[in-house]
Design a protein with these regions (language model features):
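Short, acidic loop-to-helix structural element flanking the phosphoryl-transfer center
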Residues: 19-36, 83-91, 138-139, 195-207, ...
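Asp-based phosphoryl-transfer active-site loop
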Residues: 2-18, 94, 229
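Short active-site oxyanion
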Residues: 36-40, 60-62, 154, 214-215, ...
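Conserved acidic, metal-coordinating active-site core of Asp-based
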Residues: 97, 101-104, 108-219, 223, ...
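Short, structured coil segments at secondary-structure junctions
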Residues: 57-60, 67-68, 175-177, 231-232, ...
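Mg2+-dependent phosphoryl-transfer enzymes with acidic/Ser/Thr/Gly-rich catalytic loops
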Residues: 1-5, 22, 190-270
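Hydrophobic packing residues within well-ordered alpha-helices of enzyme cores
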Residues: 25, 50-54, 167, 171, ...
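Active-site phosphate-binding/coordination module
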Residues: 23-125
Length: 270
């Protein structure tokens, strides 16, 4: 087997536009695992959102990576092997920046997600992710975080597609090098502590399974997947990926055409 570990993004890579996962991809994952390969999903989603979807893939053991690499959990037990997050002062600063500009913002702990706005965009988010968001009313998100002493894992802003990159640049300029600003879709901007990108997942799995990075493959579609793919030995991008990711990876079929299955065949040396 050429690559003994295979890390895959979820939305836009495994999950098609209609929210489903193809049987071809499911079969390819099962075959790769049956041959001795370790397959792990690495997503920006929270654990409560991704764990139920793993059952669709027939994955009932192993590890799953959530929150852009900040959290690693045991699939069978839900036990946390890694759970990093913000210093509270940093989380408050980021939330104040977003709320001062009137953005639709989310703040995540390892178990829950809170939002400052109840609207159609939030309803759509809940449907896609399969989670119930806690609406904060009568106070700012930053005030709730401070009052309850929340340990924040991730902060997100929902935006119109044409506002995504401008907000990313604004946050990068305002926050500096101590934070990681990225995007996981055309309407989401996400902020993590510096060093908590999906590249951290490659390093974690390499150490956990005692497999060198040269024998780890990764695939994705969005800018938040670039660090993971760049860190891996086998670099893949689905055909619908962002140009920045395609530039550093071997491009396979799109998510709608079972690109993950194609990459898994290559990873297995077929």
């Amino acid at each position: 087997m050429k690559y003994r570990i295979f890390l895959s993004d979820f939305d836009g890579t495994l999950v098609r536009a209609d929210g489903t996962i193809s049987q071809t991809n499911k079969n390819a994952i099962a075959a790769y695992r049956a041959a001795g390969g370790v397959f792990a999903v690495c997503t920006g989603r929270m654990l409560a959102s991704i764990l139920p979807r793993l059952k669709e893939l027939g994955i009932e053991d192993g590890l799953v990576v959530a929150y852009q690499g900040a959290t690693v959990a045991d699939v069978r037990t839900g036990a946390l092997l890694k759970n990093d997050g913000f210093e509270q002062a940093d989380a408050l600063r980021i939330l104040d920046l977003l709320e001062d500009d009137g953005h639709h913002a989310h703040v995540y702990t390892v178990q829950d997600v809170y939002c400052n706005r109840d609207d159609d965009a939030l309803r759509a988010y809940e449907r896609v992710c399969g989670v119930k968001v806690r609406i904060v009313r009568g106070e700012r998100l930053s005030a709730r975080v401070k009052r309850e002493g929340m340990r924040v894992v991730k902060i997100l802003a929902m935006v119109e597609p044409d506002a995504r990159r401008p907000l990313m640049e604004k946050l990068k300029k305002a926050l500096g090098d101590g934070f990681y600003v990225t995007t996981s879709s055309d309407c989401l901007v996400e902020v993590m502590p510096a060093g908590q990108s999906k590249a951290a997942a490659v390093d974690f799995l390499s150490e956990y399974y005692h497999v060198p990075r040269a024998e780890i493959a990764a695939i994705g579609d969005q800018l938040n997947d670039v660090p993971m793919v760049a860190r891996a030995g086998g670099r893949f991008a689905v055909g619908n990926a962002e140009p920045e990711l395609k530039a550093i990876a071997r491009v396979v079929s799109s998510v709608e055409e079972d690109g993950v299955a194609e990459a898994l065949q290559i990873a297995a040396g077929e």
